[in-house]
Amino acid sequence: MGDEKDSWKVKTLDEILQEKKRRKEQEEKAEIKRLKNSDDRDSKRDSLEEGELRDHCMEITIRNSPYRREDSMEDRGEEDDSLAIKPPQQMSRKEKVHHRKDEKRKEKWKHARVKEREHERRKRHREEQDKARREWERQKRREMAREHSRRERDRLEQLERKRERERKMREQQKEQREQKERERRAEERRKEREARREVSAHHRTMREDYSDKVKASHWSRSPPRPPRERFELGDGRKPGEARPAPAQKPAQLKEEKMEERDLLSDLQDISDSERKTSSAESSSAESGSGSEEEEEEEEEEEEEGSTSEESEEEEEEEEEEEEETGSNSEEASEQSAEEVSEEEMSEDEERENENHLLVVPESRFDRDSGESEEAEEEVGEGTPQSSALTEGDYVPDSPALLPIELKQELPKYLPALQGCRSVEEFQCLNRIEEGTYGVVYRAKDKKTDEIVALKRLKMEKEKEGFPITSLREINTILKAQHPNIVTVREIVVGSNMDKIYIVMNYVEHDLKSLMETMKQPFLPGEVKTLMIQLLRGVKHLHDNWILHRDLKTSNLLLSHAGILKVGDFGLAREYGSPLKAYTPVVVTQWYRAPELLLGAKEYSTAVDMWSVGCIFGELLTQKPLFPGNSEIDQINKVFKELGTPSEKIWPGYSELPVVKKMTFSEHPYNNLRKRFGALLSDQGFDLMNKFLTYFPGRRISAEDGLKHEYFRETPLPIDPSMFPTWPAKSEQQRVKRGTSPRPPEGGLGYSQLGDDDLKETGFHLTTTNQGASAAGPGFSLKF
């Protein structure tokens, strides 16, 4: 627009007129020329050419056309006027202002359009760059992910190969150990069989010699009778009298008797070696050296699979012993028949034979009882008839030459307990805890100075025999050996049958007393570690068809190494399929499952899993989850937290005995999530709900609990060795503290725990006037 303004030029009037005149002249010349040309065309068209005919229609049309030449001239004149240069018109100020505004607006709009196009171009450029950058980053992430997955896959493959190699190596070592153990046991059995055969052959030879001697004495009884009587009365031959000829045979019999005693001592050594292998830890503590027997005993503890082989070998030994016992009993019966058939036997010889019986090795317990017999025989060798056998002291038919004589008195311990150590070999330090069916003490082995836990079994009615509860506890705890279950070392006895103790490895803490002294609760990683160990122990019990039936925090032990162990098997028992009716009065009240509270008599492993859920909540909050004051209050507390069950969520709920008799208040909602809040994640709360499911058939098992995602999310479980340590309460002065309610007891007439501690037998606390122990710290033993 600026260029157009600059090209304008103001013309004068003369210039305008001249320009107009010049244009007019040009137009006239052009018109004249056009008319001339048109006349020439008309003249040419008026005269027909040769052979051309006139078209009247066309002529008429042209002549009568509305477009005349004058009109065309006028139109051309108007066009010429529009093309003519006119003088510039004067613009007013207002028009000029408006014109400038329009120009500015157009310029601004044009500039805005240019700026917008530039902005869009830059925006498209940035978007293309961002897209390219994102694509590059995405590609980079894909490559990094592929690289990471490849490295992780390689690492896992290496780890798997390493584990496979270790597993194969362990299997090879295990096979080698089993092979060595089998060879050793086979060698021991072979030696034992050879010894038994030698003893039985020796006994058979002695019986034959004795029968021959009896027959000979029957047919020629009168001649040698007076000298024997004179010798017994002290009127025998003189000191200088010659020794009679038959003295060689009794000397030979005496040598055979000494050989028999040596063979019996060898048998006793073999039985002692078997007892040592059965109590591996005690024998290793006594030896103190790395002998082969100690290594074999430790291997036996680690190998749980070898128990089946040992049981088979023991069955074979028992069968062999029964066969030999049968053969020996047959021989003894034949011998007795021969003795009865001798009608002419003298009355003196019959009285002698009535007091003496032949020894027949029947079982290991008989061989164990032979120790006391052999000791008394050695004591009796100082008598003239046994030890003072000189050349001048010959007795023809002395009873001392007969086979070994059985003692009429019982040994100090019963045969079933032969080989058990005495409790006197332990120094009791202090009392730790009262269990379901006994009292636990902390003691020290006097030989090895090891600290152990001694649990005295509660003998409910010892006059009626060994109590079934104690027998069940010993059998269960010996069967369920596992790293997360208390380890039994041996069984020791006191002076009487009512004093039987289980020797266990000493563990420093129980979770109940530990949580009461802790200033801060367990960390989430520590709770996961404890729960994993608890579930492993419970899984091992359930895999071996064992119900614990008394899981609670006071029965869970924690060592300084962070290893959790399940203890107190006083209420444990084996179960089978199909389920049988058991007593519902089991499990401590706070940890008792709802089916037990409502009177169900058929139950299974689900009762232990409910207790595990209660322990889980107590580990998180350091408080019992359902601390009821009575069974009814316990049921109400459970229903208030979890909601009242119905037949829909618990099939068979309405058929339970307590539900038929009572009506409970309705609690429609589960309020358990509010109780834990931030202490428990969503996965943890899901696991808690599965532990505390009403219907036992839907309650989670220990095996499935170990596979739950709660143990794989962050924070992960910590290593047990990273657990903090606390001072052991059992090693300090015992203080009274709040405990969970007592478990169900053994019924009417069941004596209170710890009553025997006040008697003169068993453990007794003896102190001086100043309060110090009279015989060192702790308890002293009295019997």
Swiss-Prot record:
Induction: The p58 isoform is specifically induced in G2/M phase of the cell cycle. SMART domains: S_TKc (SM00220). Residues 279-290 have a biased composition (Low complexity). It is found in: Cytoplasm; Nucleus. The modification Phosphothreonine is found at residues 476, 583, 739. CDD domains: STKc_CDC2L1. Residues 18-396, 721-783 are annotated as: Disordered. The cleaved p110 isoform, p110C, binds to the serine/threonine kinase PAK1. The p58 isoform but not the p110 isoform or p110C interacts with CCND3. The p110 isoforms are found in large molecular weight complexes containing CCNL1 and SFRS7. This is Cyclin-dependent kinase 11A.
